[in-house]
Amino acid sequence: MKRHILATVIASLVAAPAMALAAGNNILSVHILDQQTGKPAPGVEVVLEQKKDNGWTQLNTGHTDQDGRIKALWPEKAAAPGDYRVIFKTGQYFESKKLDTFFPEIPVEFHISKTNEHYHVPLLLSQYGYSTYRGS
């Protein structure tokens, strides 16, 4: 029994830094807080797109965790300067709470100029409004 507990502890100590490192190397993260409840918004789909010519190309998608975060949204490829957007698909989040919303999708466009920096896009959300900014 003691060996099993010790093995579990050692495995978690080895895995945690590796996961943190993977998220730490990723240049893009998002976070959603529900302003009406003051709590994170888990399970929200977020789509990352890159502007190409006259349209948008999907690069990645993910769902927020229990803390309302996606710590590593950038796909496993090199980042390039350019125009991008994240689309927060909030309609299902409010529908699951049996609430109406005026914004079923919230696209947030941003520009990446330096690929060696981290970009964090927080979303403060309510049924009829939202706010965002470049976080850290």
UniProtKB/Swiss-Prot annotation:
It catalyses: 5-hydroxyisourate + H2O = 5-hydroxy-2-oxo-4-ureido-2,5-dihydro-1H-imidazole-5-carboxylate + H(+). It is found in: Periplasm. It holds the Pfam family Transthyretin. GO terms for biological process: purine nucleobase metabolic process. Keywords: Hydrolase, Periplasm, Purine metabolism, Signal. One of its GO terms (cellular component) is periplasmic space. Its EC number is 3.5.2.17. InterPro entries: Hydroxyisourate_hydrolase (IPR014306), Thyroxine_BS (IPR023418), Transthyretin/HIU_hydrolase (IPR000895), Transthyretin/HIU_hydrolase_d (IPR023416), Transthyretin/HIU_hydrolase_sf (IPR036817), Transthyretin_CS (IPR023419). Its main location: periplasm. CDD domains: TLP_HIUase. It comes from the Bacteria. Substrate binds at H31, R69, Y133. It is an enzyme of class 3 (hydrolase). One of its GO terms (molecular function) is hydroxyisourate hydrolase activity. Residues 1-22 form the signal peptide. The keyword Signal applies. Catalyzes the hydrolysis of 5-hydroxyisourate (HIU) to 2-oxo-4-hydroxy-4-carboxy-5-ureidoimidazoline (OHCU). NCBIfam families: hdxy_isourate (TIGR02962), PRK15036.1 (NF011610). Belongs to the transthyretin family. 5-hydroxyisourate hydrolase subfamily. Despite its homology to transthyretins, is not able to bind to the thyroid hormones thyroxine (T4) and triiodothyronine (T3). HIU hydrolysis also occurs spontaneously, but more slowly. Homotetramer. This is 5-hydroxyisourate hydrolase. The gene is hiuH.
